[in-house]
Amino acid sequence: MINVITGRQVDNLQNEIIDQAVKSYYQDKRHDVFIIVPNHIKFTTEVRALSKLSVLTNKKQVAVNKLHILSFSRLAWYFLRDEAIKLPQILDDAASVMLLEQIVKDHQDELKLFQNQTQVTSGALRQMYEAILSVRAGNIELDNIDEKKLNEETSYKIHDLRIIYDEFIERLSEKFATKDEMQLLLNQFLAKSNNLSTMEFYFSDFSHFSLQELTSVRLISKKAKNTTLAFKTKIGKIDNNAEPGDYDYVVQRTIGQLEHFWQNQQLDYQTQEYPLTQTSPSSLLNGVWTKTSGFDERLSKFLQPVKADSRYAEAYFVARTIYQQVALNNYRYQDFLVLAPNLSEYETYLTPILRQNQIPFFNDLQREMKYHPLVVAVENLQQIFKRGFQTDNVIALMKTQLFIPDWYKNSARYQNDVDLLENFVLAHGIKGKLWTKSLKSFVDADVIALDKSEKEVEDLDRLRDYFIDALTKFFEQLDKEEDPQAGVTVFWNFLIKNRVAKRLESWRKEANDTGDLQLAQQPEQVWSTLTDLLKDYLLVANKFSVDQFFDLLISGFSEANFSQIPSTLDAVNISELGMVQGQGYKQVFIIGATSTNLPQIEKIPGFFSSENLEQLNEGNEANGYLEDQQKINNLDQNYQFGNALSLASDKIYISYPVINTANEQLEPSIFYKQLLKLTRADEFAQHDLPQNNGEVLTFITNPEASLGYLTYLKNKAATDVDSLLKMTEEKIGEVAKNVLEGSSFKNIPQDLSPELAQQLYGDRIETSVSQLETYYQNSFEYFLNYGLHLKKRFENELDVIQAGNYYHETFDYLVKRIKEKKLNFADLTEEKLGELLIEVREELKEKGRYRQLLNDPFNKYLFHKLDQTTANVAHYWHSNVNKTTFRPQYSELSFGKNQKVSGLSYSWKDDNNKKKIVDLRGKMDRVDLAQVNDRVLGEVIDYKSSAKKFDLGLFANGISMQMISYLEVLKNNNKFFAQGKDLDVLGAFYQNITSSLERLSSEKMILSNYQIKDLAKESTKKLMYNGILIADEEMLDLIEPGMEKDRAVSDLYTSVKRKVNGYISWPQNQSFTPDQLDLLLAYNSYLIKNAGNEILSGKIELDPYSYGQQTSLTYSDFKDIFFFDAMLKENNYHKIKSIDKKTLLTLIREKLDLDGEE
């Protein structure tokens, strides 16, 4: 007998099916009764069936062996387990795709789509694999398709698929099968079986069957004693005239397909409409959603739309509502269902919030295996084989903690050594073949503290050697194998020898001991998946290939998920919208209802497009057809959403966030908007934080979760939550106390006491100018850097700093090499200068830190470009050497304590009349001297890798003191530089180290007559000196004799030229008279003493400077410590304004309390 029960989406047809099946089984326990449901709800259906049987038999415990609750896949295993047939080895998808790849390569010359492709992508292969499964499921005979009726695209696809399909099926038939084989075998069994006549089958919660499932239902209904199917339609009736686009088209189509079969087979069947029950809120909502009934006032209370500030607010609304309903209204956790179109978007919100509120839940979102340490290890083994010993892969392999050497007694010590080793290799730029060298060969670079710790380096070297030796031997052995069995054996032995299996077992035991059953299952499941993948590989591989072997493992693991079991039956269920759900929930939450998520329209392309499938199916439906799964899903969106709306008996919540994690605005789904209009329900606004006392109850759950919100409200004006806070403190006193204290925290660093400052810095500060500039940039950063000596992890990379160091050292070595060889720079030929530069580079690149960087081919290229730049600058110097009387005399000249050149020293008395001192040390990139007419003249050159000028605003605020300090060092050390004579200083200048050319499109390059200027000449202007220039015409003429000429323009100093009237035109804000220079020097001393005084008195402020678009935070290493937020009242930038020379000099006189005008 065949029975079809139809009802509306709100009708509990599953309950009816279970009732009938259990009663039938109870009346005659000798015959088999099967309840077939989607695999997703098999467990809950089984629990409900046994509960009904328990009530029927009046027994608390029941045992059955003829009542079966199965999915289609389990039904296949059930029937075939005792059959006298050899069940095939089911291939994993990854193995099937690998087999397909072999076939495509073998027939590539015959194919039209893949003929000219050097490599077929895994995505294309997977699409073809799914197409092959569709062809098998649809009983399509490819040879019978008339390609003349197809367009070119479809014809090409059928041509290629026919070639590949035949070979694929032939290879399968030899020894294994794809994942759909069990369904095909089930149908073969059902077609031949004569044992179904005593069996009863009940189908529930299906709206659509796959082609093979449909075949199974047809065969069962033809042969079984009783077949009962339940379907939910729009109005609970069968509609034989349903068309695509109709609300319940998909389910009506399914019923129609079955009816058509029964009628053709002349089988009797009867239909039964589920009786209308008393009107419920869910039926009212279903009525307005399906447009079968009108508005009812009860709807506005049954449906609650929620507009949330964020996904976090959405998740908290769910948790808070569940918590309060369980606490106040006698609900159980199992009464709640949470659905989302894309549950992964809420993975980092829902789980921690529910746990914080101590709400038990079961999340049926599959946990992917690809993040397990064993899978991570396999991925990095492949990368090491393909790319060599790249540091990120080697360290990642170590960090899986699967390969711990036996001399480590615990994993904590091992992890500490791995961390230290990572610091060491990053600091020394170790990658590739450098991993094979002893760590001792790198310590001469002396870049981190570990370099000085011989014992620690030895321990780390032992760890390095263990891994590199094991991996080298493993890959050598693996790479020479050609037999698949031998290759797999090498891999397996590698894992066993390195105790990976034992490590996984220890993790399983630890999780078991702590009661985490979910976690305890993972080691066993991931190991079992690995063994299955290895078996699959052996089935399909003809010849061992390391790449293919790892590809199969990684692809297989990427598709694998951990099976899950609920830790308790009384738990909130979390699932994805569109998946079949059991009924019986009281309240349902639909979250994430945004325009991009609902409806869930699929757009992922397959091998066959919808247009291709329409052509192929035209006129062929009687013999078989290819199902357009994407089209069916898209047509079923309204119906599936209606299913979700029908799941709750008491209340439905639908919500959406107004922004995503990138702070992008989100719009509500069209479904959300329709429900808002249909139900006339008031939209509830769920904020991230309570706005006032009136909202406090919308955030209250348990003490731990509520504390933060209560504390926030306490700090708001006109709110009173003291009584609630008092209750919270009674439950979690210490935690509440800490949070409340933290809520009054102001992001203002506290000053040090003078005593503590003295312990950190001493009475005498020995520092450099650049360090003191840091104090003025942000005094808190100075404290972290030079008080606590915090440093970010050093990495030996060819970054801007390293490039700058290389520039400096190149010019330093060049100047010293010229002096050592007693050469006259002016007499050098271009060729000789080039030879000297080559000598310098070769010597530099033997230094530890540069030698290590040059192991990277890309770094070699970068060094080549750096060498081109230094050569450009050196040849520029050489071309101008005869235009000036200056000659480079000193390079990288250090000054300060115990140096030939004295540093700068400043002293003062503090408030306690105690003497304090600041000693300045440093290094000048280059000092040029000239002796002309018994006068000694000097200038300082500072190399910069980008264009820079002396900025008066920055100097006024202590952020650019370096050049003025250099000038003072020169003036104070005339005995050293001028052998006791007076030293006349021309200035201190920046030298831009660049080889860049001026853009031809630049306005600077176009003359008034629209001719283009000389490119080389204009580009060399970028190399001219720019900085602090002493406006002394007599001295300038001595230094650059060419400036004596009428209307001369300086070839050396920016913006210096002789005017028509014979006077020199000086740069407006970068030139100073000797008297003005004295003022600058005096102010510089003031700034240094002021900084020293504040440092030693312990003054600390979080006061980063802001100047135009730049701030001192831009390149700071300590932003995560500062937590600087300009939106906070207590956090403010120290804003600097641009000033001119006149304003600066006036400011200096005011600060120094001096009289007089310029």
Curated annotation (Swiss-Prot):
Pfam hit, one: PDDEXK_1
Provide this UniProt record's keywords sorted from A to Z. Answer: ATP-binding, DNA damage, DNA repair, DNA-binding, Exonuclease, Helicase, Hydrolase, Nuclease, Nucleotide-binding
InterPro entries cross-referenced by the UniProt entry? ADDB_N, DNA_helicase_suRexB, P-loop_NTPase, PDDEXK_AddAB-type
Whether Nuclease counts among this entry's keywords is yes
Taken from the UniProt record, the cysteine pairs bridged by disulfide bonds within this chain are none
Q: What class of enzyme is it?
A: hydrolase
Annotated GO molecular function terms are:
5'-3' exonuclease activity; ATP binding; double-stranded DNA binding; helicase activity; hydrolase activity, acting on acid anhydrides
* E.C. number(s) listed in UniProt: 3.1.-.-
**Cofactors demanded by this protein:** Mg(2+)
A biological process term (GO) from this entry? double-strand break repair via homologous recombination
Function description:
The heterodimer acts as both an ATP-dependent DNA helicase and an ATP-dependent, dual-direction single-stranded exonuclease. Recognizes the chi site generating a DNA molecule suitable for the initiation of homologous recombination. This subunit has 5' -> 3' nuclease activity but not helicase activity.
Q: What else is known?
A: Despite having helicase-like domains, this subunit does not have helicase activity.
Q: Which family does it belong to?
A: Belongs to the helicase family. AddB/RexB type 2 subfamily.
Q: How does it assemble?
A: Heterodimer of AddA and RexB.
Report the protein name in the record: ATP-dependent helicase/deoxyribonuclease subunit B
- Name the source organism: Lactobacillus johnsonii (strain CNCM I-12250 / La1 / NCC 533)
